Amino acid sequence: MANFKGHALPGSFFLIFGLWWSVKYPLKYFHQKGLKKNRLSLQQQRIEIIEGAVKALFAVIGILAEQFVPDGPHLHLYHENQWTKLMNWQHSTMYLFFGVSGIIDMLTYLYFNIVPLGLDRVVLAMAVFVEGFLFYFHVHGRPPLDQHIHSLLLFSLFGATISICLEVILRDNIVLELFRTTLLILQGTWFWQIGFVLFPPFGTPEWDQKDMDNVMFITMCFCWHYLVALCITAINYSLVYCFLTRVRRRAEGEIIGIQKLKSDHTYQSTLLSGSDEE
């Protein structure tokens, strides 16, 4: 959809997943760090399956929104000797690949003895690459600001593609996972930024899309967005660490208290038995 909602919708999807990953991966990392064997628990497998299902659901919602809005193509690709709403079809194609990624995620953890390890990462990398590939040819012939603000998104997309491909080999690498998380948060916030710049809501003035000062500002703004993504990821990582540390200390305190009660009970029993003998 070539409007504000058409950019806010995918931006919200990516931002939700980015924020979720910024909590999930630190939790997973600290949990596995305390285990002798680096294996997923049943609870973690269920979380991964649910995440894949949510990803597929988001993709279906995105496709339906692109196809069946009032001015959408309604599944008509070619009508009356011309292509129909190709921009909506491009967005639908992007959602389609992320939907496939969600399905593969579910299969990977439902049938982990059959599905090769790393296939979920390969398909996710493919989905992100397809998104970047579509966006590269998405803005040809448009004003400079429109082209530039979309092209900046390619850096995060192709960077994420490379990072995810490395995860196929370096499985459960927290650095690569957090790097991917920051890029996804950046992608989500940047979709919103594109919507505010190209389709200003609330009656705000439109941007001059031929002004090179606007192009320079948007480049700087992109860097600010990534800094915010880094800060969000770092803050959530720290909060998870503090939360788990507090829970662990509380659990250790309860164990020590129970052991102390047992020792006191044993001591009292010994005294009573000694007094009975006397």
UniProtKB/Swiss-Prot annotation:
Question: Where in the sequence is Phosphoserine found?
Answer: S273, S275
Please give the start and end residues of each transmembrane region.
7-27, 49-69, 95-115, 117-137, 149-169, 183-203, 215-235
Q: Where in the cell is it found?
A: Endosome membrane; Lysosome membrane; Golgi apparatus, trans-Golgi network membrane
A GO CC term? endosome membrane
Classify the protein's membrane topology as the record does. Answer: Multi-pass membrane protein
Going by the UniProt record, its keywords in alphabetical order are: Endosome, Golgi apparatus, Immunity, Innate immunity, Lysosome, Membrane, Phosphoprotein, Transmembrane, Transmembrane helix
Biological process terms in GO annotation: innate immune response
Q: Which Pfam families match?
A: DUF716
Function, as annotated, reads: Plays a role in innate immunity.
What PANTHER family does the record point to? EPIDIDYMAL MEMBRANE PROTEIN E9-RELATED, TRANSMEMBRANE PROTEIN 45B
Family per record? Belongs to the TMEM45 family.
Record's protein name: Transmembrane protein 45B
Species the sequence originates in: Rattus norvegicus (Rat)
Recite the lineage of the species.
Answer: Eukaryota, Metazoa, Chordata, Craniata, Vertebrata
